[in-house]
Amino acid sequence: DIRFEGNLIFTKEYAVNVINGLVRTGRIPKNARQDKNVSAAQNFGPGLKIIRKESDALVLDVKQNRYAQDILTFISEKGADGKPIKVDALYKNFIGINGPNGKNYGLTRRMVQIYLLALAQEGKISIHLGPKSGLSEDPIDYSSISGTDFNAKTLDWLHEVHLAKHP
């Protein structure tokens, strides 16, 4: 399902750029300054199925993304009682073959991270970092994600997720 236009190769570095260019902020205004993050989001967002065009911006949207929705369903089922889900369990189930319900997802670690952070941006989940991340103990969620500058180290310390609690 995931196909990129032209001869672009989706690398771990581009994944970090996509997160900082679109997922972190939730939108790219039409007149946004072109930098490596915005370019990566524009180049890879459509293939990752995380982007929707509006008249004045490109907007993060994973509502129609089967991978993000299947990840959310997995979190909802396993964490229904408020129990956190280890990010490693998500990697185990969505990277490679033999995932939930016999599906072969074949996602990369960075793709799983993009979808998790997109779900956090949309207010569906919160993500806790491991103790050695060097960042705040506060979870990453819709209220804090835009203030986080993501890099490879941060992404590698995604530790566990919780379903969002809404008032």
Question: Which residue ranges define each predicted feature?
Answer:
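Extended alpha-helical interface modules used as scaffolds for assembling large macromolecular complexes
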Residues: 1-167
